[in-house]
Curated annotation (Swiss-Prot):
Required for the first step of histidine biosynthesis. May allow the feedback regulation of ATP phosphoribosyltransferase activity by histidine. This is ATP phosphoribosyltransferase regulatory subunit. Keywords: Amino-acid biosynthesis, Cytoplasm, Histidine biosynthesis. Heteromultimer composed of HisG and HisZ subunits. The keyword Amino-acid biosynthesis applies. It comes from the Bacteria. One of its GO terms (molecular function) is histidine-tRNA ligase activity. The gene is hisZ. It comes from Burkholderia cenocepacia (strain HI2424). Pfam families: tRNA-synt_His. Pathway: Amino-acid biosynthesis; L-histidine biosynthesis; L-histidine from 5-phospho-alpha-D-ribose 1-diphosphate: step 1/9. One of its GO terms (cellular component) is cytoplasm.
């Protein structure tokens, strides 16, 4: 085997892509900070049981596992940063009020999520802990859309769903609850024949409501239809009210409602949102409410947040990260050294061409030169 080969769906990030990823990372983290979010940096490696407190079987399958040579315990390479941030909020910070946290870091997946998807993503996201009201979901939704606009994306479609609708239907019918996982699979896949089979012997109200869900999709007007076709339960009424407010506050984007879109249902406890753009089949950002995420760490708090993959964002973002630079000669000259240092202190990129390599400058557009004029070093256009 060649020593330069990498595992399948693992790739190096070369300078041009890395520069774009870093540009977007800085933009997004600066924007998160402007909203009051504090950055945390959880470790890449943790005890397996700490990483798998939520997310179900899917997260377990996506997590790389290895044995700790010091303790003999099983470790995991994180596949999702959200449980780690929940641990930090619940166990380390232990604050009583609202906490806003953000992060950016690598996650590893045992299997790619698509044919050409990477197994090493750079996950960036933001989360609010400590507020159960819809105001937190509205802020997270706004921040997610703000981040995508900051990355230069336009014509965004926001898909909204709510875990509370199915949860309310299952809670009122024990027989349906026993088939919860199968019903979830049928609804998520819009498998109407399977859904009909699973609901044949259920109560009439539950059967009609579950069979209605795959047809309750479209723009925000579908919520009015949902109010007539679903049982009048407090949880369902609240879920539909939440979706109406989220849709009304999503300014400048297309909004779609899908009450059968339950991806992440086992993880979420309330509103769920995903962002799409034309030409990209998968969601570029996902978020929602997951109030139970900190329970395994001994402190369950209301929580809502979103995340996205920076590598995928960089692939589709029109943001240009090719920087301009100043080309300077290489010489042991104190005045030249002082001039170069002053320019770098001012934020300029100054590349000193090493002897014999004056024209090997592929990655930066050197649009200016540092030249000596009348005993002084000055910057001139090239």
């Amino acid at each position: 085997m060649s020593t330069w080969l990498l595992p399948e769906n693992i790739a190096d990030v070369l300078p041009s892509e890395a520069r774009k990823i870093e540009e977007l990372r800085r933009r997004l983290l600066d924007r998160f900070r402007s909203y009051g979010y504090e950055m945390v940096m959880p470790p890449l490696l943790e005890y397996l049981e700490s990483l798998l407190t939520s997310g179900g079987a899917d997260l377990r399958l996506r997590t790389f596992k290895l044995v700790d040579q010091l303790s003999g315990r099983t470790l995991g390479l994180r596949a999702d940063i959200t449980p780690q941030v929940a641990r930090i909020d619940a166990h380390l910070l232990n604050r009583q009020g609202v906490t806003r946290l953000c992060y950016a870091g690598h996650v590893m997946h045992t299997r790619p999520r698509g044919l050409h998807a990477t197994r090493e993503q750079i996950q960036i996201g933001a989360e609010i802990y400590g507020h159960a009201g819809l105001e937190a979901d509205l802020e997270i939704q706004q921040l997610m859309l703000d981040a995508l606009h900051l990355a230069g994306l336009s014509r965004i479609r926001l898909d909204l769903g709510h875990a509370g609708v199915l949860a309310a239907l299952l809670a009122r019918d024990a027989q349906a609850a026993e088939r919860g996982e199968s019903l979830y699979d049928a609804l998520s896949g819009k498998d109407v024949p399977l859904l009909n089979e699973l609901t044949d012997d259920l109560g009439a109200d539950t059967r009609a409501a579950l069979r209605a869900l795959p047809n309750l999709y479209g723009d925000a007007s579908v919520l009015a239809e949902a109010r007539t076709r679903l049982p009048v339960l407090p949880e369902i009424t609240r879920a539909l009210d939440d979706l109406a407010q989220l849709a009304s506050q999503a300014k400048g984007v297309e909004v779609a409602i899908d009450l059968a879109d339950l991806r992440g249902y086992a993880y979420h406890s309330g509103a769920m949102f995903s962002a799409y753009i034309d030409g990209v089949p998968n969601a570029i950002a996902r978020g929602g409410r997951y109030d139970h995420v900190g329970q395994a760490y001994g402190r369950s708090r209301p929580a809502t947040g979103f995340s996205l993959d920076l590598r995928e964002l960089a692939r589709i973002s029109p943001v240009e990260a090719r920087g301009t630079a100043i080309l300077a000669p290489w010489a042991q000259d104190d005045a030249l050294g002082a001039a170069v240092a002053a320019l770098r202190d001012a934020g300029e990129v100054v590349i000193q061409a090493l002897p014999g390599h004056d024209h090997v400058l592929d990655e930066f557009a050197c649009d200016r030169s540092l030249v000596e004029r009348n005993g002084a070093w000055v910057v001139e256009p090239r």
